[in-house]
Curated annotation (Swiss-Prot):
Belongs to the RimP family. Its main location: cytoplasm. Pfam families: DUF150_C, RimP_N. It comes from Helicobacter pylori (strain Shi470). Transmembrane segments: none annotated. The keyword Cytoplasm applies. It is found in: Cytoplasm. GO terms for biological process: ribosomal small subunit assembly; translation. GO terms for cellular component: cytosol. The gene is rimP. HAMAP family: RimP. CDD domains: YlxS_C. This is Ribosome maturation factor RimP. Required for maturation of 30S ribosomal subunits. Gene3D superfamilies: RimP-like superfamily, N-terminal.
């Protein structure tokens, strides 16, 4: 269902100059919550941007009626520290510092240099490039340094 929602709202969000990072539908305290995460290629995602996107996609979602039950729409920034789960997440996070945990229990910190539909390339501290297929990744999380 979230894939259908993503397909419906992605073009609208891009027409406003922003990028759709993720869509998730969860249940919190017996209430359905539709979370839409954005990236602003020109800087931060402000409260005004979230409100603008919410006001535009809310009626669109109501008309499409993808979600049968009542729900709360939350529009937010993708966040400074987040788990990368899909090739799209990796592509939208190029150049960021990440913590990588592999299925073979190896872990390292690196800069995400490239990503495609099958793998991601990480620049290690010694500037060597390590290419890893997504199937070999256990968890990848962006790191924000203060």
């Amino acid at each position: 269902m979230t894939k259908k929602i993503e397909e419906k709202i992605e073009g609208v969000i891009e027409s406003l100059g922003y990028l759709l990072y993720d869509v998730s539908l969860i249940k919190e305290n017996e209430q359905h919550v539709l979370r839409v995460s954005l990236k602003n290629p020109n800087g931060a995602v402000s409260l005004d941007i979230c409100q603008q996107v919410s006001e535009i996609i809310s009626p669109l979602l109501d008309v499409c009626d993808f979600i049968q039950d009542a729900y709360i729409l939350e529009v937010s920034s993708m966040g400074l520290e987040r788990t990368l789960k899909t090739p799209k997440h990796f592509k939208l996070s190029l150049g960021e510092k990440v913590e990588v945990k592999l299925t073979n229990k190896e872990s390292f910190q690196a800069v995400l240099k490239d990503a495609n539909d099958l793998s991601a390339d990480f620049e290690l501290e010694d500037h060597a490039i390590k290419s890893v297929e997504y199937k070999d990744l256990k968890k990848v999380k962006t790191l924000f340094e203060w």
